């Protein structure tokens, strides 16, 4: 089985795949202080809770934005005798990239682009509501061409509470109205409906620039469900899009016969890693 890992700045999403089938998924906080011991214990707890065996995992594929945790995850893979594959923009099996600096495209965005094209077709626009709100565009030929990055909803709310003396933290949930009736509801409107309106506006502009009003729009990320209640801009909400993309990249690597392996003693904790040849750029 494959354990797909999406290491975000705030949460780490995991999915266990048997072939192409997603058997189980879960999330845990991303803590940069975690050691391999702590990660291993947490994994064993999740697997036990769902009646699964960690021994069944023969490969772990990573896509993440927290490189300092890569060494610890490699050590966990070593303990359970699983291959460790680091997904990145230059991994041989990923979707085609036409970004100005392909090597700088985040691994999570690459995975989202692969999943969007594979499961929903091209052209497509992915809106990922996480620590940051990422919008990624795949053109009609299946190329990732760029997008946008904005502060995430939680970051915005935390900054507001920290810098505005009379505005406290409020629960993150979709408001019932677009006009807030009190201070707490006004903050929710600004955060959630504001994020929805931003997505609507950017998606509309991107569709026009792309010249394809029919581009499929997919929302994903931990907060996608909350925002989706406040807009009709999304054709699909898929909270598992990133880990499905990681699985698809791993599957393609297997088909291509790309040699995989883990090197727990040597990974550079300051830079993304790949174990495959880069895609030739046109």
Language-model regions, residue ranges each:
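Phosphate/pyrophosphate-binding loops at sites that engage ATP/ADP/AMP, CoA/4′-phosphopantetheine
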Residues: 43-58, 202-214
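ATP-binding/phosphotransfer module of carbohydrate and carboxylate kinases, centering on a glycine-rich
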Residues: 2-4, 30, 156-282
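Short beta-strand scaffold segments in enzyme catalytic cores
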Residues: 12-16, 126, 133-138
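Short glycine-rich, Thr/Ser-proximal phosphate-binding strand/loop in the N-terminal lobe
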Residues: 2-48, 142-168, 174-177, 185
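Short beta-strand-loop/turn "lid" adjacent to the catalytic site in phosphate-handling enzymes
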Residues: 50-105, 141-147, 152, 181-192, ...
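Short glycine-aspartate micro-motif
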Residues: 2-6, 59-61, 124-128, 218
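Conserved phosphate-binding catalytic cores of ATP/NTP-utilizing and phosphoryl-transfer enzymes
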Residues: 93-124, 247-255
């Amino acid at each position: 089985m494959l354990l797909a890992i999406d290491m975000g700045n705030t949460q780490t999403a995991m999915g266990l795949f048997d072939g192409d089938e997603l058997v189980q998924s879960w999330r845990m906080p991303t803590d940069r202080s975690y050691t391999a011991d702590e990660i291993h214990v947490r994994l064993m707890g999740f697997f036990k809770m769902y009646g699964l065996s960690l021994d069944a995992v023969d490969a772990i594929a990573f896509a993440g934005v927290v490189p300092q945790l890569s060494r610890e995850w490699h050590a966990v893979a070593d303990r359970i005798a699983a291959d460790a594959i680091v997904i990145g923009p230059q991994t041989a099996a990923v979707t085609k990239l036409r970004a100005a600096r392909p090597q700088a495209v985040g691994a999570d965005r690459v995975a989202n682009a692969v999943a969007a094209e594979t499961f929903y077709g091209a052209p497509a626009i992915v809106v990922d509501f996480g620590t940051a709100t990422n919008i990624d565009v795949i053109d009609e030929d299946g190329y990732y061409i760029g997008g946008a990055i904005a502060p995430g909803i939680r970051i915005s709310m935390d900054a507001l509470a920290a810098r505005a003396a009379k505005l406290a933290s409020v629960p993150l949930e979709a408001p019932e109205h677009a006009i807030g009736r009190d201070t707490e509801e006004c903050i929710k409107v600004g955060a959630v409906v504001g994020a929805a309106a931003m997505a609507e506006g950017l998606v509309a502009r991107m569709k026009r620039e792309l010249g394809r009003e029919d581009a499929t729009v997919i929302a994903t990320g931990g907060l996608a469900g909350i925002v989706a209640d406040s807009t009709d801009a999304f054709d699909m909400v898929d909270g598992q899009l990133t880990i499905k993309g990681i699985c698809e990249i791993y599957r393609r690597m297997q088909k291509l016969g790309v040699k995989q392996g883990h090197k727990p003693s040597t990974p550079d904790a300051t830079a993304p890693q790949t174990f495959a040849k880069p895609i030739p750029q046109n």
